[in-house]
Amino acid sequence: MAAATGAGRLRRAASALLLRSPRLPARELSAPARLYHKKVVDHYENPRNVGSLDKTSKNVGTGLVGAPACGDVMKLQIQVDEKGKIVDARFKTFGCGSAIASSSLATEWVKGKTVEEALTIKNTDIAKELCLPPVKLHCSMLAEDAIKAALADYKLKQESKKEEPEKQ
């Protein structure tokens, strides 16, 4: 009960501060939304394939990449079936809207592709699809790097699987 009362007081105090501050015209309030293309906003507000897969599984590849310049961190995972087709993909991204949108789009694009086909996905394709401005190209580069890292991890697991002696 005390927590609810405290939260209510906090909400009222915040509202009072907002009401006392000068109001911005609606035109100015909506300006930041125009900085992102509608495709970025869609993937940001409705991200596809958020979550994690079992990284210990032999058929799951995990890529973890980061951009020191902006602090974005992206984890992308793929699940590959016995025929070499990517059947699932998940991501978790700590970053801006463009980084989240790039991750979301990348997981959509890798699904249904073979491991080799997924290697052909380029950051320029992601940037073009999302209409990213030059200042946000590093986000699409992170997505490409995350795909490559996940594929490399998967391939490494497959090689070690072949080297393991068969259990009898």
Curated annotation (Swiss-Prot):
Processing and modification events after translation: Cysteine persulfide is reduced by thiol-containing molecules such as glutathione and L-cysteine.
Site (Mediates ISCU dimerization and de novo [2Fe-2S] cluster assembly): Y36
Chief place where the protein resides: mitochondrion
Residues bearing PTM Phosphoserine: S15
Residues that bear Cysteine persulfide: C70, C139
Active site: C70 (cysteine persulfide intermediate), C139 (cysteine persulfide intermediate)
Listed Pfam families: NifU_N
Alphabetical list of CDD domains matching this protein: IscU_like
GO biological process: [2Fe-2S] cluster assembly; [4Fe-4S] cluster assembly; intracellular iron ion homeostasis; iron-sulfur cluster assembly; negative regulation of iron ion import across plasma membrane; positive regulation of mitochondrial electron transport, NADH to ubiquinone
Annotated keywords: Iron, Metal-binding, Mitochondrion, Phosphoprotein, Transit peptide, Zinc
Chain sites annotated for binding Zn(2+): D72, C96, C139
GO cellular component, one term: mitochondrion
Function recorded in the entry: Mitochondrial scaffold protein, of the core iron-sulfur cluster (ISC) assembly complex, that provides the structural architecture on which the [2Fe-2S] clusters are assembled. The core iron-sulfur cluster (ISC) assembly complex is involved in the de novo synthesis of a [2Fe-2S] cluster, the first step of the mitochondrial iron-sulfur protein biogenesis. This process is initiated by the cysteine desulfurase complex (NFS1:LYRM4:NDUFAB1) that produces persulfide which is delivered on the scaffold protein ISCU in a FXN-dependent manner.
Subunit description: Homodimer; Tyr-36-mediated dimerization of two iron- and sulfide-containing ISCU subunit bind to the cysteine desulfurase complex. Component of the mitochondrial core iron-sulfur cluster (ISC) complex composed of NFS1, LYRM4, NDUFAB1, ISCU, FXN, and FDX2; this complex is a heterohexamer containing two copies of each monomer. Interacts (D-state) with NFS1 (homodimer form); each monomer interacts with the C-terminal regions of each NFS1 monomer.
Protein's name in the database: Iron-sulfur cluster assembly enzyme ISCU
Gene: Iscu
